[in-house]
Design a protein with these regions (language model features):
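Membrane-proximal intracellular helices of multi-pass ion channels
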Residues: 1-445
């Protein structure tokens, strides 16, 4: 036992994050297997519950059974708890229990919390965590209240539960819906494509949840004084706006030609916003043209922002790479933006993350295409959705076999936990010696 305790003390914060997510997924999968979790009162096979639990904890939204018709009220509640835990982060949830119970947060716990929410420093981490928890529940409550009139009109008292479920699912960028019935499965929000209230509330929840907790802190502290925002917050806000606006304009010009002007604008913006790893859709994605699907695939890979409820490669990663490219084109010695410069380590980390995500995306897509004999473009859309934790699909998820589902499970997990987190968890820090290898030159490009 003493040896076990010593080993636990040596566990790094990155290992705690990686194992924490895995543990919650496994626990959720076991609970969902129970007969009480399914509407038919039967034991659900482990492969289906593992996929569902992974998708919920990793806030993805890909499913192999319809959430609304297959799972009971208890099962849906379990899924919602998994979504909330995954959205906030396992470490944040555990820390919240410690704070509620009055236990002192140790320095090791504070360091782990810092890594979990991508905070710049350990100081003030407990205050920031309290702020995140309070802000999360307040925003989710407001979102649910705003949707009450629509869902209660359509579903009666059941509309209250639907409002709460979809508010949490949207804020956590999870994309799970409970609108399906035995006669119509996997509808997502297609029935509300022309409803301005549902569209706007869901889009706002997705964006607020996906821009990151530190960006919230900047907004609440500095209000509209953007000059005082952190550099990271400025980059996140600009990049998010660009990644929403450009695809929306493209979708408006290339798709939804038969819609009225208002409906077309709503559909274009919603399909763009949901690419920030949300997983809801109001339109038939399979009916969109191939160019739009290609853009959606790329956008899903990018995902949301660091320290947020979203997964994926992250908006800051792509922003750093693009800014570095412009600096290289301009023959600038360093990458600068908003009067600040990046450390070269940031550029190196961004390139590493991008390569890792593209590798997982391509190898996963090719593997599934070979196993299932499905068009590679559809499989790449699916793997981008999984590793970017976006949750959108062209309708092939339920048709895939066990091995392909396991590939998607791994991709969802890697996409939510984060590439560098797993690398740092698997590889210990190397002690640098004083001597360095001789410097040499190599030509690229």
């Amino acid at each position: 036992m003493p040896e076990l305790i010593r080993k636990k003390k040596k566990m790094s914060s990155f290992e705690m994050i990686a194992f924490g997510f895995a543990g919650v997924i496994l626990l959720g999968a076991i609970i969902l297997m129970l007969p009480i979790s399914s509407s038919a009162g039967v034991v659900t096979p482990f492969d289906k519950t593992l996929f569902t639990a992974t998708s919920a904890v990793c806030v993805t939204g890909l499913v192999v059974v319809d959430t609304g018709s297959y799972w009971s009220a208890f099962g849906q509640a379990v899924i919602l708890l998994l979504i909330q835990t995954g959205g906030l982060g396992v470490i944040t949830v555990v820390a919240s229990f410690s704070m509620v119970s009055g236990r002192k947060i140790s320095l090791m716990q504070r360091s782990t919390m810092q890594d979990a929410i991508s905070a710049p420093k350990v100081g003030g981490i407990v205050r920031l965590t309290k702020f995140i928890l309070q802000g999360t529940f307040l925003i989710e409550l407001i979102g649910a209240i705003l949707m009450f009139p629509v869902y209660c009109r359509d579903y009666g008292w059941k509309g209250i539960w639907m409002s709460v479920f979809h508010s949490v699912s949207a804020f956590c960028n999870a994309g799970f819906d409970i609108l399906g019935t035995a006669g119509q499965t996997f509808p997502s929000l297609t029935g509300y494509i022309a409803n301005p209230l549902i569209n706007l509330v869901i889009m706002l929840l997705i964006v607020i949840g996906g821009i990151g907790f530190l960006t919230w802190d900047d907004f609440c502290t500095n209000k509209w004084n953007l000059k005082r925002y952190r550099l990271q917050s400025k980059i996140i806000l600009v990049t998010t706006a660009v990644l929403i606006l450009l695809p929306a304009i493209f979708f408006f010009l290339s798709d939804f030609a038969g819609f009225s002007m208002g409906k077309r604008i709503l559909a274009s913006f919603f399909q763009s916003v949901t690419l920030r790893t949300a997983g809801f859709n109001t339109a038939d994605l399979g009916a969109m043209n191939d160019s739009s699907k290609a853009i959606m695939t790329l956008m899903m890979l990018i995902g949301g922002s660091p320290g947020s409820t979203a997964g994926g490669m992250k908006t800051t990663t792509i922003a750093v790479l693009i800014l570095n490219a412009f600096a290289t084109f301009g023959r600038e010695p360093e990458t600068e933006v908003f009067g600040r410069r990046f450390d070269n380590t940031v550029v190196k980390n961004a390139a590493t993350i991008a390569i890792l995500y593209f590798f997982l995306f391509f190898t996963g897509g090719i593997a599934i295409s070979q196993i299932e004999h499905v068009a590679l473009s559809d499989c790449l859309f699916e793997t981008a959705s999984a590793v970017g934790t976006a949750g959108l699909t062209l309708g092939i998820t339920t048709e895939l076999g066990l091995v392909s589902h396991l590939i998607l499970v791994v991709l969802m997990y890697l996409g939510r936990v984060g590439g560098l987190t797993l690398i740092y968890a698997a590889i210990s820090v190397k002690i640098q010696s004083g001597a360095k290898r001789p410097l040499d030159k190599i030509t690229v490009g």
